[in-house]
Regions:
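Alpha/beta-hydrolase-fold enzymes
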Residues: 136-188
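An N-terminal hydrophobic leader/cap segment in hydrolases
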Residues: 1-10
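Short beta-strand element of the alpha/beta-hydrolase
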Residues: 30-39
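Conserved acidic catalytic loop of the alpha/beta-hydrolase fold
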Residues: 90-111
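A short loop-to-beta-strand scaffold at the N-terminal edge of the catalytic core in hydrolase folds
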Residues: 14-25
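Conserved hydrolase catalytic core segment
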Residues: 109-149
């Protein structure tokens, strides 16, 4: 029944910038899922019709293009350099909080399901830890459990393939030598 279903996209102002949110499902009364993509920069909104096939019968799914990603990037292209400087974990956590608040206002639900994939699991789990009162549950896919180990592992792999003595090698070594024991957002 098309009258019960939903397929729309919007650009609400979230944390001071236009951010792309796409909402799809066959019944607006189904539980709402906010999907947080990986990357950063790994939007799935363009292929969600494939990835969510079947799920949209049971859930209403909101896909969000994070700051400096795909449609959010293009909606703010004139401010992209300025926005790139604001991409901290705290900015992403605030974005998630404001998107949930926006979705709550527009779609009139009590709580939603938060689902994070890869990088999205890092910011999604942190949001869930801070704001469980807004969630039915949190689902992590490809959950990052130790961000530092993940970054250092990747950097060590990079050192094996980038040219020795290059500026890229210097940058990667700098990351290895200066990456904090605990991320600044991990206070517990």
């Amino acid at each position: 029944d098309n009258k019960k279903g939903i397929y729309l996209y919007e650009y609400p102002i979230i944390n001071g910038i236009k951010q792309y949110v796409q909402v799809r499902g066959t019944d607006r009364k189904n539980p709402l899922v906010l999907f947080i993509h990986g990357g950063p920069g790994g939007s799935v909104a363009g292929m969600c019709h494939i990835l969510q096939n079947g799920w949209e019968d049971k859930f209403t799914i909101a896909n969000w293009d994070q700051r400096n990603t795909c449609k959010t990037y293009f909606a703010n292209k004139d401010k992209s350099k300025e926005i790139a400087k604001t991409g901290t974990i705290e900015d992403f956590i605030k974005d998630i909080d404001e998107i949930i608040s926006y979705l709550h206002t527009v779609y009139d639900f009590e709580k939603l399901i938060l689902m994070g994939f890869s990088w999205g699991s890092a910011i999604g789990s942190e949001y869930a830890k801070r704001h469980p009162e807004n969630l039915l549950c949190y689902i992590g896919i490809g959950q990052l459990t130790n961000y530092r180990e993940n970054v250092l592992f990747t950097c060590k792999k990079l050192l094996k393939i980038i040219p020795k003595g290059s500026k890229d090698e210097e940058k990667v070594k700098h990351i290895i030598n200066t990456f904090p024991e605990r991320p600044s957002w991990d206070k517990n």
